[in-house]
Amino acid sequence: MNPIEIKDLYSFTFYGGLKTKGRNVVFVKAQANEANNNYEYDLMLCKDGKISQLTDRKNVSSYTFEDKKTLWFTLPLKDDEKKTAFWRLPLKGGEAIQAEVINQPGVQILDFINPDLMLLSIEHTPEDKHPHAEDYEVLAESPYYMNGQGFIAGKRTHYYLYDRKTKTLSDPITNGLKPDVFIVKDGKIYFAANEDKGARQSFFSMSLYEYDPIAKTRTHLINTHMDLFNLDADENRLLFFASDGRQIGLNSNPKLYAYSLADKKIDLIADWHECLGNTVGTDCALLGGNATCMDKNRLCFTSTVVDHNNLFDVDGDALHQILEWPGTIHSFGFAKGVLYFIGAKPGELQELYKMENGEVSQISDFHPELKDKYIAQAKPIFYTGSQDSSQLGWVLYPKDFDPDKKYPAILDIHGGPKTVYGTIFYHEMQLWASYGYFVFFCNPFGSDGQGNDYADLRGKYGTDDYEDLMKFTDTVLAQVPQIDSERVGVTGGSYGGFMTNWIITHTDRFKAAASQRSISNWLSFWGTSDIGPEFVVDQQACGLENPEKLWWHSPMRTISTAKTPTLFIHSDEDYRCPIEQGYQMLNGLIQNGVETKMVLFHKETHELSRSGKPVHRERRLEEITNWMDTHLKGTKHEA
């Protein structure tokens, strides 16, 4: 068997954005292009079990169905990327035809109200007419930047209607609001939104609105006093999962509600205590998906349970589990009553599956390149966590494993913290297993998939979660004697980066560390992160009025105790965990005489490891692997 390599990234294909109409199942395919250092996006069709590629445009950005026979998608206009071209594609065959041009960049098609009226999403940036405007930013509202968007002063995204007959674009129908989820029902548009007050506001203040495109009227239906996760509809109700944050703050699992269009009131359908959607981490799921979908009048949804996804339905007011899946369900829909989904099994990348009459079958074979590769299967290890409960972790064994030899190992810590690790294919982990490492990972206290109580890490960062990770490490070393306890490294990103920082400032049991897009100082994080004020108050159970507590939970407080050689990976446009967090740790280790370095990626965001430029993702893996090789194997690499 051949090893997994870093450059395998360029052979992987990624899938998502699945939508259905009639018997047609359409989804997006993406693949990294090494020469252009970007990703190429095109549309795929599955009909009657046969898969074909619909487009060869390389940059399809959004699409929707006009009807069962016709698809629309958007592209930047070829000769003027400040405009968006709409293309109309017959699904029975034939060439796509450029049908409309909108004098705005990045326009997204959301849906058709009727054959002549389209619902669009457009972002507007106010024009700065001052000379050399590109040389500065004017910040007068908060948040002033957002990860993945850059500086957002004055930028607003609104819904518009485009009339194909008159070739006219309406005024924004969401003016004065910050729209979120939406649904088109019976010729009307229903959406959830917060008021646009030009400043931060509570997550738990969304209202429901109705827009009538015939009367051109917008009606405020009700203030939910909640944060909505989706918006679907049956015959006479709007259905949505929502949280009021009263359980465990921002990370509270949502409950299922219905808004009666007749009675104008909200009813609780299910006091759901689990999470909504797929929160299993991977670096091989580039495209987005959906957590809910209607099958006629039946609402279906996915949920993460410990380390995998299950599918449920709501028939009337009753919940039923309709599929227990061993891996992940990234995107799904129904075509003529048959479930189709893009998912991944343990140790595998994404494929297209269908479930008919209770039987699941795989339709696609997207990844023949992995058939001759060594894929380490995740072996379960149970340990007793900080909550005195039995918890599940996993170990990947190195390629060509010899039980009579000793091997280095890497503890990998997920982000979130309210996400999970599962057993699906994870490129970085499989790479290290192919390169001769044990890789071990778990879901410490604060992770998703085990209810609100287990996820409630508020005010406890670096305590029970740290204890879990140390107990898990102890258990792994006891049960896998082939791991050399003197050659164990640790890495993680985001929350995993915070934990890596916490670990190196509280123990020297790890001989190398790679801290990625991390948090090191909750006091400065409050003022520099795009989500700082609300996230700090929520996750630390206090704000700046209690600086002593924020400082106690900051790895910088104990930086003088750190001895572990540590690599820092950060991006200069990461506004979620800003680069100053890494700078503080870097300076602290340098002052202490600890071996360290930072690799800073320009024009990358918090998403570097998942959707960063392909060449940058390659360099990131090289840097971490070389750092571990140097300190755990004694292998020298060129700088």
Residue ranges and their predicted role:
Residues 1-13, 48-49, 169-171:
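A short helix->beta-strand "capping" segment at the edge of beta-propeller domains
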Residues 11-24, 57-75, 99-119, 147-149, ...:
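Conserved beta-propeller blade repeats
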Residues 35-40, 78-83, 150-156, 199-206, ...:
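Short, solvent-exposed loop/turn segments at conserved positions within beta-propeller repeat blades
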Residues 41, 123-160, 205-207, 254-257, ...:
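Predominantly five- to eight-bladed beta-propeller fold
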Residues 47-49, 90-94, 163-167, 212-216, ...:
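Short loop/turn segments that connect beta-strands within beta-propeller blades
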Residues 82-156:
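Asp-box/WD-like beta-propeller blade repeats and closely related beta-sheet repeat scaffolds
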Residues 366-486, 493, 527:
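Cap/lid segment of the alpha/beta-hydrolase catalytic domain
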Residues 444-639:
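Active-site-proximal cap/loop segments of hydrolase catalytic domains
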